[in-house]
Amino acid sequence: MIKEFLEYDTVRNNALKLANKIYKDGFIPDVIYCSLRGGAYMANIISEYFKILAKVNKFHPVLYAGVVARSYSDVAQHTKVFIDGWTYPPENLRPGDKILLVDDIFDSGRTINCLVETLMNSRGMPREDIKVVVHDYKYFTYYNEQLPIQPDYYCRKFEINSPEENRWIHYMSHELVGLSKKELEEYYFKDDPELIDVLSPYLGDK
């Protein structure tokens, strides 16, 4: 498996360019839903961009909200998604509202599919009024079936033709789990030695 360390400023810059593309495409959201935790950094940036656009171009404020969902396996080893809650419940959405649903990555896609289906079913929202936005889009070409909901906007797309081609993307904006001692030294301690006392007792081949 390929492992990539993705700098936070790369995500920031890509998110700004993607937000501009969404706007240029004529899609102005009423609500930006951030899928927590992974989508927070990218969604914050997109929300800020639309806040500026709303002020300059005199359109409606864009509500920023969050949703917490998690995947788990039941006794039959079927993966299911449980939604813990929404900071702005879908029941409050109005007919015609436009939605951006933002996450860091589309991997298995189960969580995104569950969230979009919940939005569509709870308020009868058409799919075209919901745009799925991710930084990284993994498309597994060897899967026999693809989930119905796929990203509408993404910064990078990886077509993965075999399990060996899969990649682990480490988002340096918020992730710490799974770091080796060598990775800590290269990506964290080298730039800021004070982090040695902060992280080394708990991470790095423990």
Language-model segments: which ranges?
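Alpha-helix termini
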Residues: K24-G26, F50-F59, Y88-N92, M120-R127
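Structural beta-sheet core signal
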Residues: G66, L101, V132-V134
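Short glycine-rich phosphate-binding loop at a beta-alpha junction
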Residues: F27-L36
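PRPP-dependent phosphoribosyltransferase catalytic core
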Residues: E117-K206
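Short, glycine/charge-rich flexible loops or terminal/linker lids adjacent to PRPP-binding catalytic cores
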Residues: K55-I99, D107-E117
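Active-site-facing substrate-recognition patch
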Residues: M1-I28
